Regions:
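Charged C-terminal helix
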Residues: 6, 54-57, 231-266
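Short pre-catalytic strand/loop immediately N-terminal to key active-site residues, enriched for Gly-Thr
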Residues: 12-18, 197-210
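Phosphate-handling active-site elements
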Residues: 33-38, 198, 223-238
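Conserved N-terminal subdomain of the carbohydrate kinase-like
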Residues: 2-11, 27-114, 265
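Short, small-residue alpha-helix embedded
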Residues: 29, 147-148, 207-230
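Acidic-glycine-rich active-site phosphate/pyrophosphate-binding loop
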Residues: 1-6, 22, 185-199
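Conserved phosphate/ATP/ADP-binding segment of small-molecule kinases
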Residues: 122-196
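Nucleotide and nucleotide-moiety/phosphate-recognizing core
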Residues: 72, 77, 87-104, 173, ...
Length: 266
């Protein structure tokens, strides 16, 4: 029996044992958008709402096997890249994706956990910049991640356009620079494409939320898998994350809150 095409997205990211971020958040996001979710796990993390205790990375050959198994069977409409953990993993992912240049790729350069734990080295930063930025349809760094990729501080909202242009110059086709780490009662995110700048402003929410970056990049990938233009996918993703934050809850004993993805389903 044949069935109609189901929009499908792929997340290539780490597993969060606490369920708040990583592939767990990505797959819930895909489901909220009505997109079939597939995954390739780059690393297993032992973490919870208090912090990251340990990381076990996947062998690169097995990671490639996961990605190729998905791409060889499903009509994947977009891929989202999250925690890549090591330069070897970044290189392996880049090697597979370079053979599929038509596949939209959303790169979330996960380098620091919400708790402050570092998830990447300088060698990984260099690998992301050299190998994966040129493959990215969209890169979605927060301020610390953009600073790591560029090697300089981004001290204010006024500095965001220059930083976004530098990331585009490094190879990304579009940049969504998230300004949540800057001070102020309002959070400003900047989308820079070949057509120019588009700003998004939201009221800052109180609390330390876990998995916002993962969910945002996954939501953009879901929108692209549904065939939406990039700007529309980004706008819908930002709205989705804001609604999921409003419905967020604290499932553990730590301070981190997690997003309620299903409550925010479009």
């Amino acid at each position: 029996m044949s069935s109609p095409h189901v929009p499908t997205a792929l997340t290539i990211a780490g597993s969060d044992s606490g369920g708040g971020a990583g592939i767990q958040a990505d797959l819930r996001t895909f489901a909220a958008f009505g997109v079939h979710g597939t995954s390739a796990i780059t690393a297993l993390t032992a973490q919870n709402t208090r912090g990251v205790d340990a990381i076990h990375t996947a062998p690169t050959a097995f990671l490639r096997a996961q990605i190729e198994a998905v791409l060889g069977d499903f009509r994947v409409g977009a891929a989202k890249l999250g925690m890549l953990a090591t330069p070897a993993i970044a290189q392996a992912v880049a090697g597979v994706l370079a053979t599929r240049p038509q596949l939209p790729v959303v790169l979330d350069p996960v380098l620091v956990a919400t708790t402050g734990a570092r998830l990447g080295t300088q060698a990984l930063v260099a690998g992301l910049r050299r190998r994966l930025l040129p493959l990215a349809t969209l890169v979605t760094p927060n301020i610390p991640e953009a600073e790591a990729l560029l090697g300089h501080r981004i001290a204010s909202r006024d500095a965001m356009p220059g930083a976004a242009r530098a990331l585009r110059d490094a190879g990304a086709r579009a940049v969504l620079l998230k300004g949540g780490h800057l001070r102020g009662s309002e959070v400003s995110d900047l989308l820079l494409t070949a057509d120019g700048e588009h700003w998004f402003h939201q009221r800052r929410r109180r609390g330390e939320f876990h998995g916002t970056g993962c969910s945002l990049s996954a939501a953009v990938a879901a929108g692209l898998a549904l065939g939406r233009p990039l700007e529309d996918a980004v706008e819908a993703a930002i709205h989705f994350v804001q609604q999921a934050i409003v419905a967020g809850y604290r499932p553990g004993k730590g301070a981190l809150l997690v997003l309620d993805h299903l409550a925010a389903a479009p």
